[in-house]
Amino acid sequence: MALKHFNPVTASLRGTVLVDRSELWKGKPVKTLTEGKHSTGGRNNHGRITSRFRGGGHKQTYRYVDFKRRKADVPATVERLEYDPNRTAFIALIKYQDGELSYILAPQRLKAGDVVVSGARADIKPGNAMPLGAIPVGTIIHNIEMKPGAGGKIARSAGTYAQLVGKDAGYAQIKLMSGELRVVRAECYATVGAVSNPDNSNIHIGKAGRSRWLGRRPHNRGVVMNPVDHPHGGGEGRTSGGRHPVTPWGKPTKGYKTRTNKRTDSLIIRRRNKGK
């Protein structure tokens, strides 16, 4: 998919850059693979805000996407590629030889009419899923399971991928886009290829209204609040906040480590690259 640039006939279109989705399916999704979805507005079951700056936006329908790919050795034909409002990647509708329909994450270079299959004996081509132990070292993969049978968790958003860099003693080593090197069980499934829609990172929203369509509300800084609202609030005139950056609840931000799962620390060989 290419990027769409616009003539500046309005102020908001001057810098707008969007993904051209003209090649995607323009109809409705398969009804049996969808479910209604209620907007929470960032509130929990007590009505309290647990995720700030969320609310509004276009009504969405949830699509059931198969992240497990456990229907082994049954070829499926790609019927079409579709837009999914719940994720940045595109999804593909596939039809198995026995007639079952399913949605999967669409990898790059997958198109209608292609045949995909999952299983240990599948070919190494985009869209095919198999255990990491059956994938050659150096292959680009996505939708990687962290536990066998739990469904893919790693490399699922638009344009992402990982690389299988080694196999040893029943474990597979994978290198993530962040630079992290970690191991997972060799029985875990992964799908060959990189996730579709790599141009998603080049989108320029262009105007506040488009953010509202996506359910994003205005984000205001702590230094413009009152002391009752934020640790950076208050002061006479414009201030810098007067302290190292913290969250509204007083915890350090900007690089503060929050990982606490020591049980799986041994599965991370090298931590991700730090930002500048």
Curated annotation (Swiss-Prot):
PROSITE patterns linked to this entry: RIBOSOMAL_L2
Region named Disordered: 213-264
Alphabetic keyword roster: Ribonucleoprotein, Ribosomal protein, RNA-binding, rRNA-binding
InterPro entries referenced in this protein's UniProt entry, alphabetically: NA-bd_OB-fold, Rib_uL2_dom2, Ribosomal_uL2, Ribosomal_uL2_bac/org-type, Ribosomal_uL2_C, Ribosomal_uL2_CS, Ribosomal_uL2_dom3, Ribosomal_uL2_RNA-bd_dom
GO terms for biological process, alphabetical: cytoplasmic translation
GO molecular function: rRNA binding; structural constituent of ribosome; transferase activity
Pfam families: Ribosomal_L2 (PF00181), Ribosomal_L2_C (PF03947)
SMART domains cross-referenced by the UniProt entry: Ribosomal_L2, Ribosomal_L2_C
GO cellular component term, pick one: large ribosomal subunit
SUPFAM superfamilies per the UniProt record, alphabetical: Nucleic acid-binding proteins (SSF50249), Translation proteins SH3-like domain (SSF50104)
Job of this protein: One of the primary rRNA binding proteins. Required for association of the 30S and 50S subunits to form the 70S ribosome, for tRNA binding and peptide bond formation. It has been suggested to have peptidyltransferase activity; this is somewhat controversial. Makes several contacts with the 16S rRNA in the 70S ribosome.
Family membership: Belongs to the universal ribosomal protein uL2 family.
HAMAP family in UniProt: Ribosomal_uL2_B
Quaternary structure and partners: Part of the 50S ribosomal subunit. Forms a bridge to the 30S subunit in the 70S ribosome.
Protein name, UniProt field: Large ribosomal subunit protein uL2
Source species of the chain: Granulibacter bethesdensis (strain ATCC BAA-1260 / CGDNIH1)
